[in-house]
Design a protein with these regions (language model features):
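Beta/alpha (TIM)-barrel catalytic core signal, keyed to glycine-rich beta->alpha loops juxtaposed to Asp/Glu
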Residues: 110-277, 281-284
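Acidic-and-aromatic substrate-binding clefts and catalytic sites of carbohydrate-active enzymes
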Residues: 49-59, 79-84, 112-116, 163-169
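Hydrophobic faces of well-ordered beta-strands that scaffold small-molecule active sites
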Residues: 6-11, 48-50, 70-74, 102-107, ...
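N-terminal binding-site loop/beta-alpha segment at the start of enzyme catalytic domains
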Residues: 1-70
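A structural motif
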Residues: 42-45, 99-102, 134, 154, ...
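Acidic (Asp/Glu)-rich catalytic clusters
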Residues: 2-4, 61-71, 91-100, 148-152, ...
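Short, acidic/polar
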Residues: 25-39, 82-97, 141-148
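Active-site groove signature of glycoside hydrolases
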Residues: 94-114
């Protein structure tokens, strides 16, 4: 099939027990996961995006066997756990995955931490890097305001980017961090899958749904191409974290041509209600 046309990291949330809010799919079989991993590897996908909250994923990977084909990134929740317990959990995950280190470790739910906890979390990450547990360290955020309380110890910021949410592209602090070497990784490009099937969006967002459909129609794009065009048309985020429900989906993403739209920033909506742009506020179906 060839190599992926974008710098892609394979998100692994869908491989566990339950994922998403508006699109619930049956738990994926180990056989399907193995197909996805093989396809990803064959097409130059180098990194898997994990988290300690992805229930059952590590166990499945240990059973399938990753065979050291991928770099591993993970995320941890710092606030309610001690550094010692987190370190033990990370060591346990590495052992289960037969890996020596993580490519990256990010603090999950950065906004939930107090200022003192954030300082402590950064020290924790720095110590892990010094010990060789991770090559790179960073944070996972939801809103651009969260960038105001980090420092240059951070090397990676994982943040949402999609048709309904492009705030980071307009943010001065994000640009300054990127200029100073911080790598921005985009997630949620399909907005929990709703941009691939707009009928799954709540009925009270009919206007926003129609606008996205018209955006795709105007540029002659499928819903998949329309969603990916947001990443393709910007230069802040250098890596795209994507999740899939089967190998066919991954194949479609890999084959989807890069579509850069010069007017993208002028066409995407801004100032949308948080009830639409933040999946944490959605009601599970």
């Amino acid at each position: 099939m060839g190599r992926a046309l974008r710098s892609i990291t394979l998100g692994c949330a869908q491989f566990g027990k339950g994922y998403g809010f508006y699109i619930n799919t049956p738990e994926m079989s180990s056989g399907e996961i193995a197909k996805i991993l093989d396809l990803a590897f064959d097409n130059g996908v180098e990194t898997l995006d994990l988290a300690q909250g992805y229930e059952g994923v590590i166990k499945k990977f240990s059973e399938i066997g990753l065979e050291n084909r991928f770099k591993l990134g993970t995320k941890v929740k710092y606030g309610n756990s001690s550094a010692e317990s987190l370190s033990e959990a990370l060591a346990s995950d590495l052992k289960a995955l037969n890996a020596k280190q993580f490519e990256s470790i990010l603090i999950h739910d950065w906004s939930d931490l107090t200022s003192s906890q954030k300082d402590s979390a950064l020290r924790f990450l720095t110590d892990l890097k010094k010990l060789g547990v991770a090559n790179f360290i960073g944070i996972s955020v939801y809103e651009k305001s969260e960038l105001l309380e980090i420092n240059q110890e951070i090397e990676i910021v994982q943040a949402p980017l999609n048709y309904f949410y492009t705030d980071f592209l307009f943010d001065k602090e994000a640009r300054n961090l990127a200029k100073n070497g911080v790598a921005f990784h985009a997630r949620s490009i399909f907005h929990q899958g709703t941009l691939l099937n707009t009928r799954t969006l709540p009925s009270n967002f009919k206007t926003e749904t129609k606008n996205y459909e018209e955006y795709c129609k105007e540029h002659g794009l499928t819903s998949l191409q329309g969603a990916l065009s947001i990443f393709d048309s910007q230069n802040l985020f250098k890596n795209l974290v994507i999740g899939v429900s089967n190998a066919n989906q991954l194949g479609e993403i890999i084959q989807s041509p890069v579509t850069s739209i010069n007017s993208m920033l002028d066409e995407v909506p801004t100032g949308l209600p948080k009830q639409l742009i933040d999946p944490r506020l959605w009601t599970t179906k």
